[in-house]
């Protein structure tokens, strides 16, 4: 079995690429980073350091790489069995045109085998979004064949993969031992590939929101509250008892939405929260606050990790005071090397908190929640 994986970064190599390779899938990474592509195609292997209560170094083999802007990647799409991505939500729209070109040439080559495409991104229904973008670039004459032969499979992914510290080996990547990759089994075309570590569900949104409202919400709360107190890493921040209690409270607030929406068992979900708090405190992972907190505008989107759970608490009339504090802390985040953080701070200076909040999150500037966020923001300032 062959796969083309877009994104040869740390998550691509340390998570999806590794799971595919471990399942004896021949993986071709596609990336724009020429030195990375050159080294991967030369070495055809790399090391993954898995850290937790026990540490081990695994070697991933039988991989290669091509430039994602080249004809090579189009040729691979023509003949592959699977396409996966780990490029970040902002890049999906860019690679959509490449995938569309590959599909058109695949159909012209009369390849009638089914193909499944799975976007492994931190976004809700990311593959469905990718499908819509691909179809914009795919000539209408191919749409019926794509509908019949190409499965666009949504997924939920969870693994903490910080930047690697192996300066002597740029391909080596460090990952936590925990990983979760859940896919919507109803969206596959043809045979569903058997890949250990890829779990099937027919209720994907429950898992997507469980991860978004817990891991992602907790992670970003830790980052923004940690930044306020001058912490440099997620572990430093979560070992601050005051922050830990607030992060836990925020995850419980978002968890109440999940319990009401999907009928999750409260005890089981509380255990999931505790497990995530333990992952944040992993002493073997150096996860920088600025890595987690970057791109605050994206992370303040109405379908992302702070606003979506907040909207759920409004829908169900449940507690949200800690989530509101996290949102206020997001507007306090500064990072001169992050264009989104700079843009957000510029808007705050020019427009003030509530107009900026309304513009970037969609929350009504005159709502009770907006006024509370403003009050907390002024207290934090």
UniProtKB/Swiss-Prot annotation:
An annotated GO cellular component: cytosol
Gene3D superfamilies, A to Z: N-(1-d-carboxylethyl)-l-norvaline Dehydrogenase, domain 2, NAD(P)-binding Rossmann-like Domain
Gene Ontology molecular function: mannitol-1-phosphate 5-dehydrogenase activity
Binding site for NAD(+): 3-14
Catalytic activity: D-mannitol 1-phosphate + NAD(+) = beta-D-fructose 6-phosphate + NADH + H(+)
Alphabetic keyword roster: NAD, Oxidoreductase
Record carries keyword Oxidoreductase: yes
Pfam families tied to this protein: Mannitol_dh, Mannitol_dh_C
Classification via InterPro entries: 6-PGluconate_DH-like_C_sf, 6PGD_dom2, Mannitol_1_phos_5_DH, Mannitol_DH, Mannitol_DH_C, Mannitol_DH_CS, Mannitol_DH_N, NAD(P)-bd_dom_sf
EC numbers on record: 1.1.1.17
KW NAD (keyword) present: yes
Enzyme category, top tier: oxidoreductase
Example GO BP: mannitol catabolic process
Family: Belongs to the mannitol dehydrogenase family.
Name of the molecule in the record: Mannitol-1-phosphate 5-dehydrogenase
């Amino acid at each position: 079995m062959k796969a083309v994986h877009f994104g040869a970064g740390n998550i691509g190599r340390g998570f999806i690429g590794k799971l595919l390779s471990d399942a004896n899938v021949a993986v071709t990474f596609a990336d724009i980073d020429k030195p990375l592509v050159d080294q991967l195609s030369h070495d055809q292997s790399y090391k993954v350091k898995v850290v937790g209560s026990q540490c081990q170094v695994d070697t991933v083999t039988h991989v290669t790489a091509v430039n994602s802007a080249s004809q090579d990647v189009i040729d691979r799409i023509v003949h592959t069995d699977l396409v996966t991505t780990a490029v970040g939500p902002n890049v999906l729209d860019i690679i959509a045109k490449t995938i569309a070109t590959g599909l058109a040439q695949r159909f012209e080559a009369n390849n009638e085998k089914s193909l499944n495409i799975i976007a492994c991104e931190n976004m809700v229904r990311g593959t469905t979004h990718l499908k819509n973008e691909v179809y914009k670039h795919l000539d209408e004459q191919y749409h019926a064949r794509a509908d019949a032969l190409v499965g666009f499979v949504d997924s939920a992914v969870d693994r903490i993969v910080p930047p690697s510290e192996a300066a002597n080996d740029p391909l080596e990547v460090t990952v936590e031992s925990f990983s979760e990759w859940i896919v919507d089994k109803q969206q596959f075309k043809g045979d569903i590939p058997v890949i250990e570590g890829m779990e099937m569900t027919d209720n994907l949104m429950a898992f997507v929101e469980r991860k978004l409202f817990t891991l992602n919400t907790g992670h970003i709360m830790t980052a923004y509250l940690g930044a306020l107190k001058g912490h440099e890493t997620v572990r430093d921040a979560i070992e601050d008892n005051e922050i830990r209690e607030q992060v836990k409270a925020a995850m419980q607030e978002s968890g109440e939405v999940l319990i009401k929406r999907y009928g999750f068992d409260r005890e089981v979900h509380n255990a999931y929260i505790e497990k995530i708090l333990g992952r944040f405190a992993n002493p073997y992972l150096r996860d920088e606050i600025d890595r987690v907190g970057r791109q605050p505008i994206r992370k303040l989107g109405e379908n992302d990790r702070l606003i979506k759970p907040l909207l759920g608490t409004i829908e169900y009339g449940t507690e949200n005071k800690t989530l509101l504090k996290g949102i206020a802390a997001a507007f306090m985040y500064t990072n001169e090397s992050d264009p989104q953080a700079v843009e957000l701070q510029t808007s705050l200076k020019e427009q003030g908190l509530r107009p900026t909040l309304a513009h970037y999150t969609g929350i009504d500037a005159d709502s009770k929640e907006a006024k509370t966020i403003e009050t907390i923001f002024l207290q934090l300032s």
